Amino acid sequence: MQPGQAVIMEGELEKRSDNLLQFWRKKLCVLTKESLSLFPDAQKKSKCKELKFQSIKKVDCVERTGKYIYFTIVTTDNKEIDFRCLDQSAWNAAITLALIEFQNKAAVQSFRSQQGTNTRVAPCV
């Protein structure tokens, strides 16, 4: 996570471990316009794992069972990372909206760079 980035949401998510037993591990998560950062402790003293939106393809497999919402983040190299959150926290929706906003901005920038900086797009009426 870059210093000075505006925080969209901060709180607890559970990530399924990659090992054979696949335990759910609680992580302190910080969502910004650029990434989702996962800290192993609540004090943010340990090194975080940062999932940059440029390396995320989509949020997939949203399923609600009991008090949890389960979802999967799919990376651009097709790695799947499983998460769950409490139903009322709506982490899956916040991550999805931030990812869509990031992807839309990237698409507009790509379009503008292909068209040249002098071309303007007319607003929809």
Swiss-Prot record:
SMART domains: PH. Its main location: cytoplasm. Plays a role in regulating placenta growth. May act via its PH domain that competes with other PH domain-containing proteins, thereby preventing their binding to membrane lipids. It is found in: Cytoplasm; Membrane. One of its GO terms (cellular component) is cytoplasm. This is Pleckstrin homology-like domain family A member 2. Keywords: Cytoplasm, Membrane. GO terms for biological process: positive regulation of apoptotic process. GO terms for molecular function: phosphatidylinositol phosphate binding. Belongs to the PHLDA2 family. Residues 7-100 form the PH domain. It comes from the Eukaryota. Pfam families: PH. SUPFAM superfamilies: PH domain-like. Gene3D superfamilies: Pleckstrin-homology domain (PH domain)/Phosphotyrosine-binding domain (PTB). The PH domain binds phosphoinositides with a broad specificity. It may compete with the PH domain of some other proteins, thereby interfering with their binding to phosphatidylinositol 4,5-bisphosphate (PIP2) and phosphatidylinositol 3,4,5-trisphosphate (PIP3).
